[in-house]
């Protein structure tokens, strides 16, 4: 869809043929091209905006996320499938690998996330659910440590990973939730004024907003809507957002939630006409906004 809500393309190429995908693990739009990552078939497929297949790039590992493309370069995140977590693809050739995998963690730290990459102009940021460090690549260069998140002494200590051998993801989180550790970096976004990301503390999802100008940060568990439904409070656990490279943020609102909310809260203008005609089985409404600078 365009940002005006107009349908741009409906792509349906599911299958096992060379120009088909078994599922969409991730995708990225690069100008006139749409690049789809098919984890199960270990490949990426590039289509044009008419849905025609342009090329297929085969992988030797199971990748779960693809980064935006900068300078004909992108990164693939494969979790713990190879000796390194990140692979750099430059001009459609394997170029380098980054972030060596700790073999002691391969059995329990393979965790999926909505996002692992964020683009800000010519920079690509990489982040993971169980990692306090955010990495950065500029103009397709090496992926280097950029930020370390300090959860005010609540970070998971290194000893937590080394002192006990966990059987699986459930065993790891059962032990983690017995302690008051903060962890995760979800949906990281950064512009000239703010850095924002999600995390977990005591089983609850939180959102942190850091103001570069004032050198201050706030962490909160709810968002008060003063745009669509004034007075509506949304738990962070229900607040899923996607970051555009221009710094804007897209929040999908499920149609059934909008219908439920309008029975209690009066929709604000100029959104009232859209909200009042929304049906429960409609596509999600997309709220696009920018940070106040």
Question: Model segments located where?
Answer:
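Repeated scaffold domains used in trafficking and secretory/extracellular systems
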Residues: 22-26, 61-69, 107-116, 182-187, ...
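Asp-box/WD-like beta-propeller blade repeats and closely related beta-sheet repeat scaffolds
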Residues: 19-24, 37-84, 97-109
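Structural motif
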Residues: 42-45, 81-88, 131-136, 203-209, ...
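Short coil/turn segments at the loop-to-beta-strand junctions that recur within blades
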Residues: 12-19, 58-65, 101-106, 149-155, ...
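Short beta-strand elements that form the blades of beta-propeller/WD-repeat-like
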Residues: 29-38, 71-79, 85, 116-135, ...
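Conserved blade-ending motifs and adjacent loop-strand segments that build the rim/top face
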Residues: 146-173, 177, 213-245, 259
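Loop-centered beta-sheet repeat module
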Residues: 91-143
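Blade-loop segments of beta-propeller domains
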Residues: 1-32
